[in-house]
Curated annotation (Swiss-Prot):
InterPro entries assigned: DIOX_N, IPNS-like_FE2OG_OXY, IPNS-like_sf, Oxoglu/Fe-dep_dioxygenase_dom, Plant_2OG-oxidoreductases
Name the record gives this protein: Flavanone 3-dioxygenase
Reactions that this protein is recorded to catalyse: a (2S)-flavan-4-one + 2-oxoglutarate + O2 = a (2R,3R)-dihydroflavonol + succinate + CO2
Protein's pathway: Secondary metabolite biosynthesis; flavonoid biosynthesis
Keyword Metal-binding: yes
Species of provenance: Petroselinum crispum
Amino acid sequence: MAPSTLTALAQEKTLNSKFVRDEDERPKIAYNKFSDEIPVISLAGIDDDSVDKRSQICRKIVEACEDWGIFQVVDHGIDIDLISEMTRLARQFFALPAEEKLRFDMTGGKKGGFIVSSHLQGEAVQDWREIVTYFSYPIQARDYSRWPDKPEGWRSITEMYSDELMALACKLLEVLSEAMGLEKEGLTKACVDMDQKVIVNYYPKCPQPNLTLGLKRHTDPGTITLLLQDQVGGLQATRDGGKTWITVQPVEGAFVVNLGDHGHYLSNGRFKNADHQAVVNSNSSRMSIATFQNPAPNATVYPLKIREGEKAVMEEPITFAEMYKRKMSRDIEMATLKKLAKEKVLQDQEVEKAKLQMTPKSADEIFA
């Protein structure tokens, strides 16, 4: 049976138990307590003939990738009208009646469409979000029957948007290729036939946002991700294993750029894979549009260049399909172990409770 949407659950006073996370996974800072630690980099002049201007921009990008694996770009050349239209139509889709959205339900392994929430196999707790997924590259593999046909015009706008974002991603990969001492197309070529999917995230208002996450902590498996977010706030990043978190300051018209595991491995660990999550709030719904650029399944994953004195961060070359499979297996195993540990604690508590109830009473208690 197709799931209901989060709209009804968002109206309740308490959070449904399937979204309640363990204390160690709950938000540590507020969705709107913004930090300016993530650099905002202007790309104005990156294509100019001025070597100095380009080198300055490239240096800032490289430093951000070495420091956080995440940064924001402005003056990126993407038409502001296209961005506005993509955002407007996405909001209209999520405002549709549940039955309209669920016509594109992608549960059961369907390639693209709408889905309510998300969680790993073996994990009980779900993320507080609704999603539309477009598999947009390779172009010849697009299945337009899985692309929502409402609101009118969204399909064609998404096509234009995905093309523009692919071009921007490749431009940023050129910068990182040069920084690694490779030819401009080094990282792009390593992806073979680059894959892309566009995921539109909708995070409804939440009755108890301190108990859940819109999207649990993770790193992206692919090469590079470009995220367009609204001004509400909720994207958070960490670089110390989750001990401390910052909320990324939303910047109007900017794209948040973060590197994934594939980009991390190709750079031999020089560039960080951004460790991030999304939190929700009880005041405003939030929307973001993430565009993931990934290598082809058969692309080789291994450092493209190993600097003198360094060791490879991988034992052997593997395909991206195998890398992704191992990542998912590890995540599922960790989720399963955590679930079993939680169940064991509850069982132990029940046993202790039963023992206390069976403890013989003293004579004073019996004759009281």
